């Protein structure tokens, strides 16, 4: 069709007209998911044909979600809303132990590498701050993770956020280009789409203060445990140009 795919459209349309593009963009995104699903099926069938599927651990996760005008914006990288942070995480253990079991506890990106290393019988690196989400028997080990921290520094948008099972706090710089409120507090039980900002309500100030303190604790721990910078290397000018075009430099 004539509509640009989600992965390539931003350079052409920074702010698409939602009345014209919302449904086509969502459909394009769904098509990409279906395309990926077909190839994952082929991968799994290949593992089964080679006798590897039953003894293999598989972790499926997305790097981020996408905005489809949920909060008056598009694409990704500019906010810490749920549509960007809450992504699928599927773990298939050897012999499909605990297959079909859902875990409603908190899971964080920093936990993925320790989980995969643990399943392989290897220790996590000293610089890793996460922890295994489960063990080889399929037993969940993340029941006591109470909070998940996220931060964003992209295109002038500086944000920190903390999420518990029932609350979400997002802080942003006052002059952020995206134009989001500097403080946002959401009840994730009654308002999972994050449409009612509770930050200014007098009865919410105590929990707001507590969540701000938790964000500060996370920031302090990150600085205290930050590894030493690695060696710098020169990169090819062509590679640098490609990385700049993708927004990584």
Residue map of PLM features:
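Catalytic domains that recognize anionic headgroups
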Residues: 1-249
């Amino acid at each position: 069709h004539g509509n640009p795919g989600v992965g390539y459209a931003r350079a052409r349309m920074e702010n698409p007209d939602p009345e014209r593009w919302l449904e086509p963009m969502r459909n394009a995104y769904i098509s990409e998911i279906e395309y990926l699903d077909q190839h994952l099926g082929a991968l799994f069938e290949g593992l089964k044909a080679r006798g590897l599927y039953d003894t293999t651990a598989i972790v499926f996760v997305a790097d981020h979600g996408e905005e489809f005008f949920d909060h008056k914006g598009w694409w990704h990288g500019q906010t810490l809303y749920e549509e960007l942070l809450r992504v699928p995480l599927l773990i298939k253990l050897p012999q499909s132990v605990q297959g079909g079991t859902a875990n409603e506890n908190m899971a964080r990106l920093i936990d993925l590498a320790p989980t995969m290393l643990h399943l392989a019988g290897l220790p996590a690196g000293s610089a890793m701050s996460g922890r295994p989400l489960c063990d080889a028997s399929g037993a969940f080990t993340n029941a006591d993770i109470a909070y998940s921290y996220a931060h964003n520094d992209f295109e002038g948008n500086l944000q920190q956020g903390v999420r518990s099972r029932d609350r979400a706090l997002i802080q942003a710089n006052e002059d952020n280009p995206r134009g989001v409120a500097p403080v946002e507090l959401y009840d994730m039980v009654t308002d999972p789409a994050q449409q009612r900002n509770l930050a200014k309500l007098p009865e919410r100030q105590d929990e707001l203060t507590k969540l701000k303190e938790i964000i500060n604790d996370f920031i302090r721990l990150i600085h205290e445990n930050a590894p030493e910078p690695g060696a710098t290397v020169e990169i090819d000018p062509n590679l640098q140009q490609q990385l700049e075009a993708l927004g990584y430099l």
